[in-house]
């Protein structure tokens, strides 16, 4: 998700 959106990766990690 980092390649498309760094924020999305953060949200997905905190689920």
UniProtKB/Swiss-Prot annotation:
**Swiss-Prot/TrEMBL cofactor(s):** FAD
Q: Give the catalysed reaction(s), semicolon-separated.
A: an L-alpha-amino acid + O2 + H2O = a 2-oxocarboxylate + H2O2 + NH4(+)
| Cystines in this chain | none
Per the UniProt record, which residue ranges are transmembrane?
none
- Enumerate the GO terms in the molecular function aspect: L-amino-acid oxidase activity; toxin activity
Q: Which GO terms describe its cellular component?
A: extracellular region
| Swiss-Prot/TrEMBL keywords | Apoptosis, Cytolysis, Disulfide bond, FAD, Flavoprotein, Glycoprotein, Hemolysis, Hemostasis impairing toxin, Oxidoreductase, Secreted, Toxin
Where does the protein end up? Secreted
- Belongs to which family? Belongs to the flavin monoamine oxidase family. FIG1 subfamily.
- Quaternary state and interactors: Homodimer; non-covalently linked.
Q: What does this protein do?
A: Catalyzes an oxidative deamination of predominantly hydrophobic and aromatic L-amino acids, thus producing hydrogen peroxide that may contribute to the diverse toxic effects of this enzyme. Exhibits diverse biological activities, such as hemorrhage, hemolysis, edema, apoptosis of vascular endothelial cells or tumor cell lines, antibacterial and antiparasitic activities, as well as regulation of platelet aggregation. Effects of snake L-amino oxidases on platelets are controversial, since they either induce aggregation or inhibit agonist-induced aggregation.
Q: What is this protein called?
A: L-amino-acid oxidase Bco23
What is the organism lineage in this UniProt record?
Eukaryota, Metazoa, Chordata, Craniata, Vertebrata
